């Protein structure tokens, strides 16, 4: 996994946490759900990239 991918995935997760917290604070269920989705996507992308690295022997 390239460093750029790690940074993008981590940024997506962080952005998701901010969205989720903002959604909770403002009682905005849609924003909260978007935040959870962004976090899930960031985690999923990291999992896929880590699996690729493992298969490549990195």
Swiss-Prot record:
InterPro entries the record matches: CsbD, YjbJ_sf
Region named Disordered: 1-58
Short name of any one Pfam family annotated for the protein: CsbD
Biased composition (Basic and acidic residues): 1-39
Similarity remark: Belongs to the UPF0337 (CsbD) family.
The protein, known as: UPF0337 protein CE1672
